[in-house]
């Protein structure tokens, strides 16, 4: 049995650990770059903390209060001004995501930074996305968007009314003289996906 909660400051360290662990194990760009949990945490701990602090993030916890699935959300204006821990291991990722910046929202927007689940077959990630959609509307957001890096999240977002507004193909993507994402075979593109509320 899993309980849906709104993430609060008492969960910050667990939320950061969960996302770092989940992404280096299953997120295509993190795997392609061979990121460690330390690399991921160093680069993204500030935004993960802010996602919890802003109060728009949710999780499912088990009976022992361990996070089993979560979604980290942040208002776009805060996301846009975020400072990251710059390490060379994540530079190609920032470069790739930067190529999606041709789309920026023109009204109050909530950004889905991360969604993940350690539990399969229970629909926990889908329930978290639905909760985000419901909550964003009640807080006056006009849009929700996320940068979806794998086919599973892309299909889930599309099923819930998100449209692709930008994409970059992994194969052949060049960072300097390297092609760091050529090893990604599970998904063809990274997609920026947007839902109008």
Swiss-Prot record:
Gene3D superfamilies in the cross-refs: 3.40.630.30
E.C. code: 2.3.1.57
Recorded consequence of changing residue 27 to Q: 26-fold reduction in catalytic constant and 126-fold reduction in catalytic efficiency
UniProt superkingdom: Viruses
Pfam (any one): Acetyltransf_1
Amino acids binding acetyl-CoA: 22, 115, 117, 121, 123, 125-126, 149-150, 159
Ranges that cross the membrane: none
InterPro entries: Acyl_CoA_acyltransferase, GNAT_dom
Residues covered by the N-acetyltransferase domain: 102-182
PANTHER family, per the entry: AT07410P-RELATED, N-ACETYLTRANSFERASE-RELATED
Protein name listed in UniProt: Viral polyamine acetyltransferase
């Amino acid at each position: 049995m899993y309980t849906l909660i709104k993430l609060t400051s008492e969960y910050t360290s667990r939320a950061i650990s969960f996302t770092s662990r989940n992404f280096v194990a299953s997120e295509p760009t993190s795997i392609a770059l061979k990121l460690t949990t330390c690399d991921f945490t160093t680069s993204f701990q500030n935004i993960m903390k802010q996602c919890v602090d802003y109060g728009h993030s949710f999780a499912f916890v088990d009976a022992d209060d361990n996070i089993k699935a979560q979604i980290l959300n942040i208002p776009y204006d805060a996301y846009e001004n975020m400072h990251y821990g710059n390490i060379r291991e994540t530079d190609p990722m920032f470069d790739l995501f930067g190529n999606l910046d041709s789309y920026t929202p023109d009204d109050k927007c909530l950004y889905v930074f991360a969604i993940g689940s350690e539990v399969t077959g229970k629909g926990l990630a889908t329930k978290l996305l639905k909760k985000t959609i419901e909550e964003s509307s009640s807080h006056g957001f006009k849009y929700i968007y996320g940068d979806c890096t794998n086919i599973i999240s892309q299909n889930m977002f599309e099923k819930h009314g998100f449209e692709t507004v930008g994409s970059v193909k992994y194969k052949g993507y060049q960072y300097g003289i390297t092609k760091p994402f050529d090893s990604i075979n599970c998904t063809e593109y990274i997609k920026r996906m947007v839902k109008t509320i």
